[in-house]
């Protein structure tokens, strides 16, 4: 029997659609599914919605009601403590505003039949509502069906929504009720460490709602000061401690998972928020605690994280307590950025952008304005951008630029030499940009002038958080 656990708090606008996606499962709701619905002290009509389904399906619906809000962890623990007593129970966690594809549970049943030794398995996640598309970790589902965390240490699992647990994993799962974010990642990864593996249900889909008002727990968590204080101990370091108890060390899977998630703190959008939330002293303490978290994570693991060069440099700088920069290797016509033997980026793949004509800057009126402000590179005063068209080279004028890049309040890039202005020759409807640096010329992207605007070609910034 599949038990679908849905904690709900003030989600009357979504909960019916969520429950209906379970009732409509092709495997057969009344024959194979039990709904465990928890109203966590809602102040809207959520509890009344749950009672409607209990009245309609009395043999397939269990409801619990808390007078006061206890938090999602307490709600899940309440359900688990009862369900784990049931024979042959398999639990699926579903958030009260998310949905299941109609064959999701059937796909899970097929998976467990083929993989009888696996006790944890996850559905693929697709976003819907305010944002559509695939979760950035969905690539895992195309690579393998069962993740052995010793071999596939770079296959992290963070979310609990869409995850099935049974047998020993169901007995082991427990959520830290002191936490109101990342409690799911901590709980599921303790189980994964215990099992040593987890499954990927390639054709099963979990629809994750991104609300237009960003009111979900995940969205709100970044504005909670606790995320930058106690969370580092209760989340990251707690998982590391569990790894030490289980394996006598922080295994590569945990190292990669923590470093992969920690990089989010260093993204531009998060950095600006952190700077507003934390005082100067709190920021210093936060960085000090980040260093403690990073201590057991090997540089090789960090170098494998899919992130931008400045984020990786900042992670290593915090870890080592000194400024660390990616290695630059110059060839005849390129510059390769790498760290610990892992190639991160190539200069030739970066883009120069043209933003339009200038109207207010004296001496530059009517000229086109461009900038080469890639996160991987900061131009020096001796560097310059050039343009080439059918063997003719033109060097544009340098234009004042105040753009800078900050991470956790620290300036990591200064683009004062990155901007330029130029007049477009009448017969230059297309040309290629290049940069002269370190005594060599590196060709960059090709641009085309069409219908009064510029279109540029070239690779998008990989893992660009800026």
Language model features by range: what are they?
Residues 11-25:
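Short, well-formed alpha-helical segments that are part of the catalytic scaffolds
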Residues 1-3, 34, 186:
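Cell-envelope/extracellular polymer assembly enzymes that use nucleotide-activated donors
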């Amino acid at each position: 029997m599949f038990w679908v656990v849905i904690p709900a708090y003030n989600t009357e606008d979504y909960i019916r659609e969520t429950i209906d996606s379970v009732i409509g499962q092709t495997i057969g709701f009344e024959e194979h599914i039990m709904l465990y619905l928890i109203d966590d002290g809602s102040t809207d009509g959520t509890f009344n919605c749950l009672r409607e389904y209990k009245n309609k399906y009395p043999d397939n619906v269990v409801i619990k009601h808390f007078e006061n809000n206890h938090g999602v962890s307490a709600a899940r623990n309440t359900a688990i403590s009862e369900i784990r007593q049931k024979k042959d129970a398999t639990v699926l966690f579903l958030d009260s505003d998310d949905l299941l594809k109609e064959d999701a549970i059937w796909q899970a049943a097929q998976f467990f039949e083929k993989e009888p030794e696996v006790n944890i398995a996850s559905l693929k996640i697709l976003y819907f509502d305010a944002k559509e598309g695939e979760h950035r970790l969905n690539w895992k589902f195309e690579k393998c069906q069962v993740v052995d965390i010793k071999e596939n240490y770079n296959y992290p699992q963070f979310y609990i929504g869409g995850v099935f647990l049974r047998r020993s994993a169901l007995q082991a799962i427990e959520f830290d009720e002191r936490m109101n974010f990342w409690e799911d990642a901590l709980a599921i990864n303790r189980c994964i460490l215990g099992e040593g593996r987890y499954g990927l249900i390639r054709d099963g889909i979990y629809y994750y709602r991104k609300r237009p008002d960003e009111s979900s727990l995940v969205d709100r968590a970044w504005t909670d000061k606790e995320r930058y204080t106690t969370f580092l101990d209760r989340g990251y370091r707690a998982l590391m401690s569990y790894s030490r108890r289980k394996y006598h060390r922080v295994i590569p899977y945990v190292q990669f998972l923590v470093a992969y998630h920690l990089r989010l703190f260093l993204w531009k959008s998060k950095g600006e928020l952190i700077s507003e939330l934390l005082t100067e002293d709190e920021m210093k303490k936060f960085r000090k605690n980040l260093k403690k978290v990073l201590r057991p994570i090997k540089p090789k693991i960090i170098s494998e994280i899919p992130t931008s060069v400045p984020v990786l440099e900042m992670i290593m700088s915090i870890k080592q307590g000194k400024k660390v920069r990616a290695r630059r290797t110059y060839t005849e016509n390129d510059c390769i950025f790498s760290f610990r033997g892992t190639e991160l980026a190539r200069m030739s793949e970066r883009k120069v952008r043209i933003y339009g004509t200038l109207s207010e800057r004296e001496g530059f009126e009517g000229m086109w304005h461009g900038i080469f402000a890639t996160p991987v590179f900061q131009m020096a005063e001796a560097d310059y951008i050039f343009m080439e068209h059918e063997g003719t080279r033109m060097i544009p004028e340098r234009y004042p630029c105040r753009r800078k890049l900050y991470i956790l309040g620290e300036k990591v890039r200064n683009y004062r030499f990155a901007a330029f202005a130029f007049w477009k020759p009448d017969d230059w409807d297309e040309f290629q940009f290049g940069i002269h640096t370190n005594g060599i010329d590196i060709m960059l992207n090709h641009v085309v002038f069409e219908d009064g605007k510029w279109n540029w070609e070239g690779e998008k910034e990989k893992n660009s958080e800026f």
